[in-house]
Swiss-Prot record:
Signal peptide: none annotated. The gene is ectB. This is Diaminobutyrate--2-oxoglutarate transaminase. Induction: By osmotic stress. One of its GO terms (biological process) is ectoine biosynthetic process. It is an enzyme of class 2 (transferase). It comes from Sporosarcina pasteurii (Bacillus pasteurii). Its EC number is 2.6.1.76. Transmembrane segments: none annotated. Gene3D superfamilies: Aspartate Aminotransferase, domain 1, Type I PLP-dependent aspartate aminotransferase-like (Major domain). It holds the Pfam family Aminotran_3.
């Protein structure tokens, strides 16, 4: 590499890169290589990765099976860029996705390639919902995060993120998420707004939600609430959109995060780990009766990322059996028990545990929010990569690779506990 003692990588980044950068501030080192759940920086320091590319690396860094498929594809001059033209890679993915994911779950969706990122799939979902219903309004939920383009920002909850739009964000309204009220029924509250013609809330084209709010604080909706939302959508002829960009692809223990609730969304948004290897890819799943796009009505240059599609097809092999799902569910219990123990052992945090599957967090209580950032910083010093979540950054957030072995998981959780003790006792 080109870096020398006189040419430090972080100095170059700080000098040359925009002030908008964030993760290089939280994790102030220059990373050089990674494998599975481990990352090494230029000084050779090893880190256990409990961040996994913000949920883009469910199968770990440089997954060997996917790497081999990508390298073979490239070495055989497979088509890398094709917009939405037909390719062997595209056809194989569509067939495998149907056979491995959709058909066993009795789900019937058309697959749309809207672009390479999570916000692309969300934008396409909003557009088709408005086209199908002829309505403009969208109901989203408190503490939601759906992306950084204007449509996605309009349905996100965090005020500082919304303010970055620089223009009014219209035709949306935010309603209380399941965990928003300490006392009271969020479903009843929402239904009153829909029923009362004097509420000022126009009948929406769609409701969009995350079953577990990744950026909003690891708030996990109850299955009862999710079923209640679906029931309202059916009663009022509203489309239900599930944003499974971060919570999907096995992160909660099932391929789709909504499976245990027994609901069937009209539209599903997938990105991040749908690409398997960390390469950019997004898909939008649309019930066939709602797939009323005109050809080319929604398009984009990078819809045909064939190397990502090749990796995505290989990633689906993990779901041909229930081995990975069972492993995630087993290891999730280890995380939950350890987090509960940390909460009990350090009452100074006034903390609670949140989330499910491999999407869990420790939420520091009112007046103690700053502890979360300090704990993550101390954990990084000790060799564990974790980020915070929530409107005040009050949640220590676990997003490790689903494929991490139990020994490494327990080791990383031990380091997190050491970091917590040092921060609390200092």
């Amino acid at each position: 590499m080109l870096l020398t003692k006189e040419k430090n990588g972080m100095e170059i980044i700080e000098e040359r890169e925009s002030a908008v950068r964030s993760y290089s501030r939280s994790f102030p080192t220059v990373f050089e290589k990674a494998k599975d759940h481990l990352v090494w920086d230029v000084d050779g320091k090893e880190y256990i990765d409990f961040f996994a590319g913000a949920g883009s690396l469910n199968y770990g860094h440089n997954n060997e099976k996917m790497k081999t498929k990508i390298m073979d594809y490239v070495m055989n001059d497979g088509i890398s860029h094709s917009l939405d033209m037909g390719t062997v890679a595209r056809a194989e993915f569509l067939e495998t996705f149907n056979e491995v994911i959709l058909r066993p779950r009795n789900l019937d969706y058309k697959v749309m390639f809207p672009g390479p990122t999570g916000t692309n799939t969300v934008e396409s979902a909003l557009k088709i919902a408005r086209k199908v219903t002829g309505r403009q309004n969208i109901i989203s939920f408190t503490n939601a995060f759906h992306g950084m383009t204007l449509g996605s920002l309009s349905i996100s909850g965090n005020s500082s993120i919304r303010n970055g739009a620089g223009v009014p964000l219209t035709n949306t309204i935010s309603m209380p998420y399941d965990t928003f009220f300490k006392n009271g029924n969020a479903i009843d509250y929402l239904e009153q707004y829909l029923e009362d013609t004097g509420s000022g809330v126009d009948l929406p084209a769609a409701m969009i939600l995350e079953t577990v709010q990744g950026e909003g604080g690891i708030n996990a909706a109850s299955f009862e609430w999710l079923r209640g939302i679906e029931k309202l959508c059916r009663r009022y002829d509203i489309l239900l959109i599930i944003d499974d960009v971060q919570a999907g692809c096995g992160r909660t223990g099932t391929f789709f995060s909504f499976e245990p609730a027994g609901i069937q969304p009209d539209i599903v948004c997938l990105s991040k780990s749908i690409g398997g290897y960390g390469l950019p890819l997004a898909i939008t799943l649309i019930k066939p009766e709602h797939d009323i796009w005109e050809p080319g009505e929604h398009n984009g240059t990078f819809r045909g990322n064939n190397m990502a599609i090749v990796a995505a097809t290989e990633a689906l092999s993990y779901w041909k059996t229930d081995d990975l799902a069972k492993s995630v569910q087993k290891k999730s219990k280890i995380i939950k028990l350890r987090f509960e123990q940390i909460v009990e052992d350090y009452p100074e945090l006034k903390a609670t545990t949140r989330g499910r599957g491999f999407m869990q967090g420790i939420a520091c209580g009112k007046g103690k929010e700053a502890y979360a950032t300090k704990i993550c910083a101390k954990a990084f010093e000790k060799g564990v990569i974790m980020e915070t979540s929530g409107p005040s950054g009050e949640v220590v957030k676990f997003l490790g690779a689903l494929t991490i072995d139990e020994t490494s998981l327990i080791k990383g959780l031990g380091i997190l506990e050491e970091a917590t003790e040092e921060v609390v006792r200092q």
